Curated annotation (Swiss-Prot):
One of the GO biological process terms: negative regulation of transcription by RNA polymerase II
InterPro entries: GLI-like (IPR043359), Znf-C2H2_ZIC1-5/GLI1-3-like (IPR056436), Znf_C2H2_sf (IPR036236), Znf_C2H2_type (IPR013087), Znf_ZIC (IPR041643)
SMART domains: ZnF_C2H2
Intrachain S-S bonds: none
Protein name (Swiss-Prot/TrEMBL): Zinc finger protein ZIC 2-B
Gene source species: Xenopus laevis
Keywords attached to this entry: Activator, Cytoplasm, Developmental protein, Differentiation, DNA-binding, Gastrulation, Metal-binding, Neurogenesis, Nucleus, Repeat, Repressor, Transcription, Transcription regulation, Zinc, Zinc-finger
Low complexity compositional bias, start-end: 434-452
């Protein structure tokens, strides 16, 4: 039985061998040449399978074919070949009609295995295994030069930067996908066109006018999930890809290079911390501050400790910071002065150790109290008999103790209630505003004011104004009471709402 070598080796000139069986006596030499070429091609494919960029499971679907398109096979229609009609594009037929293909589908490869990758095509820019294996730096440069119909190996052409990853569909007779790639899954991000591109290059904004290629190491779109490969190549190429994906679509949830720039900007920008300590022994009048600048808080604190605060030999612990509110009042101990200076410098050397909190404190006592919010510890119990309330710090307990004592200096003039804080009294006054009848009949209200005038007219600026009065009435009463005549208008009904 004779071999049908037409779909397999059209580049060898044997494409018409199986189509013309009445001339088979004239082609025995071609059969031998085809067998030798098949062995050589198999060796090339095996060497290609060892390439780190290609999965070995895909190698059955590829073969090197620098010649024209092949005829239709069981794996799907190829291109428009010499003897094969124009059929539907095969799963890995990577060449548009009329162009040479670097990879064509094998006739015997099952179509079901190729279906997941049927939407991806690559550039017809690799005409030999050497071009495919060792053309490492360009990636998509060949496709950009060849024209819009060709596609890059790892990056889409310039006209297909915004191709949507979900628009994969079944391709028909002359239709070619735009922006599809040969090896998906390297990085599931879009590369967007940038206004800073110039001749295929991106200005990185770094010293020395460093430029990076935008079409090199371009990020690709793919529905495949290959986290190991994506993470490996991202860590390898992301330093060369800074800022190239700033205009990526918002529905992608990947880490963008902007975070890297923000981190580097925070590390590179120097802070100017100025020492405002005024040396009391200087003879200048007015006295000038130190005004030394430092780039880190550690340098400023070290300078303050060595040059100004001094060691244990200092007997007077006075803060001489410019415009200090203490105005030369000394501290009893050096550590109190050190804690006070942090108010001026902004130093907060005590961070919260709990993960995700991020709070920092200037004093260790405040950190100790704060950590109780994480642990739930409440060591301070109410000292009133019968009360089991507990608190995280003593100040909260002290405020609570006013509930049990008579120390409530803020009295309500509308009733007999008293409060420990003026904010509580203001909140209570809203109750009287919502119930005007109760406020008029309150005994405290009648006893606190003259009977001839309403309670709200005695002190217009107080918080216990009559709620029945409109704002216009209050202003009118204020003007009348502050006038020289001291008489009130006779018609009060005009002031009520």
């Amino acid at each position: 039985m004779l071999l049908d070598a037409g779909p397999q080796f059209p580049a060898l000139g044997v494409g018409t061998f199986a189509r013309h069986h009445h001339h088979h006596h004239h082609h025995h030499a071609a059969v031998a040449a085809a067998a030798a070429a098949a062995a050589e091609m198999q060796e090339r494919e095996l060497s290609l399978a060892q390439n780190s960029f290609v999965e070995p499971t895909h190698m059955g679907a590829f073969k090197m074919n620098p010649g024209g398109g092949s005829g239709g096979g069981s794996g799907g229609g190829g291109g428009a070949g010499p003897n094969g009609g124009a059929g539907a594009s095969g799963p890995h037929d990577l060449s548009p009609p009329g162009q040479t293909s670097a990879f064509t589908s094998q006739a015997g490869y099952p179509a079901s295995a190729l279906a997941p990758h049927s939407a991806y095509t690559g550039a017809a820019a690799f005409n030999s295994p050497r071009d495919f294996l060792f053309r490492g730096r360009g990636f998509a440069e060949g496709s950009a030069a060849a024209g819009g119909g060709q596609h890059g190996l790892f990056g889409p052409p310039a006209g297909s930067l915004h191709h949507h990853p979900h628009h994969h569909h079944q391709l028909s007779h002359g239709e070619h996908p735009q922006g599809h790639l040969l090896f998906p899954g390297i990085h599931d991000q879009h590369a967007a066109a940038s206004q800073n591109t110039l001749g295929g290059q991106m200005r990185l904004g770094l010293p020395g006018e460093v430029f990076g290629r935008t079409d090199q190491y371009r990020q690709v779109s793919s529905p495949r999930g290959d986290p190991y490969t994506a993470a490996q190549l991202h860590n390898q190429y992301s330093p060369m890809n800074m800022g190239m994906n700033m205009a990526a679509h918002h529905h992608h949830h990947h880490h963008h290079p902007g975070a890297f720039f923000r981190y580097m900007r925070q590390q590179c920008i120097k802070q100017e911390l100025i020492c405002k300590w005024i040396d009391p022994e200087q003879l200048n009048n007015p006295k000038k501050s130190c005004n030394k600048t430092f780039s880190t808080m550690h340098e400023l604190v070290t300078h303050m400790s060595v040059e100004h605060v001094g060691g244990p030999e200092q007997s007077n612990h006075i803060c001489f910071w410019e415009e200090c509110a203490r105005e030369g009042k000394p501290f009893k101990a050096k550590y109190k002065l050190v804690n006070h200076i942090r108010v001026h410098t902004g130093e907060k050397p005590f961070p919260c150790p709990f993960p995700g909190c991020g709070k920092v404190f200037a004093r260790s006592e405040n950190l100790k109290i704060h950590k109780r919010t994480h642990t739930g510890e409440k060591p301070f119990q109410c000292e009133f008999e019968g009360c089991d309330r507990r608190f995280a710090n003593s100040s909260d307990r002290k405020k609570h103790m006013h509930v049990h004592t008579s120390d409530k200096p803020y009295l309500c003039k509308m009733c007999d209630k008293s409060y420990t804080h003026p904010s509580s009294l203001r909140k209570h006054m809203k109750v009287h505003e919502s119930s005007p009848q109760g406020s008029e009949s309150s005994p405290a209200a009648s006893s606190g004011y003259e009977s001839s005038t309403p309670p709200g007219l005695v002190s217009p600026n107080s918080e216990t104004q009559n709620p029945n009065l409109s704002p216009a009435a209050v202003s009118a009463v204020h003007s009348v009471s502050s006038g020289a005549s001291g008489t009130l208008a006779s018609n009060f009904n005009e002031w009520y709402v």
